[in-house]
Amino acid sequence: MAAVKFLVCSVLLVVLATQSEIGLAQNCSAAIGGLMSCGPYVLPGNQLTPSTQCCSAIQAVNHGCLCETINIISSLPGHCSLPPVSCGTA
């Protein structure tokens, strides 16, 4: 469990460090940092309901910031010479 939390923190730090626009990175940095309260909810196999803190953090994040962050995370395998991740396909 600690290793997964470390991985989540590491990914978030990489995402924040690689934002292409400084203004967006500064605005997203605090908002994305707030998403750490959602950590237990995003782990595979959990049966938890998101906490009030998590829901508040999600509400505070700009839609563009979320999309940009998801795009950056999705590109990580390619930057590590790994095949792309394809969710929902066999």
From Swiss-Prot:
Subcellular location(s): the record lists: Secreted
GO cellular component annotations of the record: extracellular region
Tell me which positions the record assigns to the signal sequence: 1-26
Alphabetized, the UniProt keywords read: Disulfide bond, Secreted, Signal
Do you know which InterPro entries this protein is assigned to? Bifun_inhib/LTP/seed_sf, Bifunc_inhib/LTP/seed_store, NsLTP-like
In this UniProt entry, which cysteines form S-S bonds? C28-C65, C38-C54, C55-C80, C67-C87
The family note in this entry says: Belongs to the A9/FIL1 family.
Q: What is this protein called?
A: Protein LIM3
